[in-house]
Amino acid sequence: MSNQEYTFQTEINQLLDLMIHSLYSNKEIFLRELVSNASDALDKLNYLMLTDEKLKGLNITPSIHLSFDSQKKTLTIKDNGIGMDKNDLIEHLGTIAKSGTKSFLSALSGDKKKDSALIGQFGVGFYSAFMVANKIVVQTKKVTGHQAYAWVSDGRGKFEISECVKEEQGTEITLFLKDEDSHFASRWEIDSVVKKYSEHIPFPIFLTYTDTKFEGEGDNQKEIKEEKCDQINQASALWKMNKSELKDKDYKEFYQSFAHDNSEPLSYIHNKVEGSLEYTTLFYIPSKAPFDMFRVDYKSGVKLYVKRVFITDDDKELLPSYLRFVKGVIDSEDLPLNVSREILQQNKILANIRSASVKKILSEIECLSKDEKNYHKFYEPFGKVLKEGLYGDFENKEKLLELLRFYSKDKEKLVSLKEYKENLKENQKSIYYLLGENLDLLKASPLLEKYAQKGYDVLLLSDEIDAFVMPGVNEYDKTPFRDASHSESLKELGLEEIHDEVKDRFKDLMKAFEENLKDEIKGVELSNHLTSAVALIGDEPNAMMANFMRQMGQSVPESKKTLELNPNHAILQKLLKCEDKEQLSAFIWLLYDGAKLLEKGALKDAKSFNERLNSVLLKAL
């Protein structure tokens, strides 16, 4: 087959342009990414050798080999892993089908240091090699194939694929280094970078180099060159080591390599269990959220091993989805090596490991919560996701409630339910909360006024998930939850019922409101829980389901709501005497617009509102 030329997809071209011209900070991470990719290829081959009958007889010692030529300014990374065929090369190294390129580009901030730190997290690590290389040659052969292929590119919009000769399965990547980056073709530089980032890659990494010695003295001195191949990493699964052997630095360096994250984790949990079940877990709580945390197709951050043999890294059942930000490893001694991913979903051993792991992780989060400043670093990126557990994890619901934090009417900072309950007033029977789309609008809600008169605090819930999970939370520490906008809550305030004579007096005015707003509202009611506000938009029918649909990205048709009026307000008292129908209509619409502003913070038809306001002002002046 002759050389076939292909064009990179548009997003790949943008990415390569950034790699070549912009992201100069921390260039050395390219080697971390290529070694990590090689390790993944070895993991995948190990898994296939356990599950594919045709490959069970393969006798392979998995390893990664690095070599360099300082004269030619080349660096080569070679593995004997799963390898790639022609389609794999096109898909993985030419399109965005299997990478996070689009997400990476949208996440760029313009800060070179921060942006270079994103490379590994978005699955675009291979392209980081173009930061140091002006040409890359990939030679690869898939373990299930017969033909080897070469992929060549200078990163300038195109790449070529051709057939080549390669006996062993696996991938060999040769970088032709730029002049200014030729120092990476040196023994000490490679050794230093590997020890920094890839010390605990669970496969041996060998470095081939030429060792020069001098024998004799004076004119008789001879230069003797000897080619050597040394293992330069520990190749130890860090999670299998004794905690007493490890330092904080070891855990953090392993995290940075494992999670492709240059930042330090907030915390880690290393646990070894022996008894009826034997397994080891090492979990990390990151300091920042994964880029895909709120995507349906998020990638699990946990890898499953059986007796140190990699099984899968895309099983979302290893931990519940509300802990999807957690990174780490589960290594079981009891699962069969040839376990399939389908069997994993019903496996009792894994279910027990999962249950115990969740408790360990929640306990660690509880430890973080004891330091308010430190907990804020956790809660800001992960608090919304943690709330999701209230819907599905009934076993740990009480623990989750302890860990959640909320804004409230009386506090500027986030408060726990324990803190809220400690400040309950003497006659207060419930924990009150108010749902809305915006914290500032919730703080301005007229509904809060009657609660304020009683001295009752109200939790203000503005996260999208709140409307879905909170109605399913009945109580905390034997104290019931109540939606502050519901009639049961308002009854607890001891408000007097609106008398029939008041209803009779407002009957005609309410009818005028209904006639003017018939296309906008479901109906009009007099309210006894408003103080300074004239009007308020009531609850949306099926609010919980509507909010859930919005959260899932589905369009929700606008539903009509009830308009609540304050019969004690001076404006309504004056409107009772208004006989000018045109002027009354303008006032009614202005009051409705005001209520909509309190609810949404904006109006759909600002032009009409402005015209009505000008008309009323003109008549008043």
Located regions from the model:
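GHKL/Bergerat-fold ATPase module in large chromosome/replication-associated machines
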Residues: L118, I136-K158, K178-S182, W188-L621
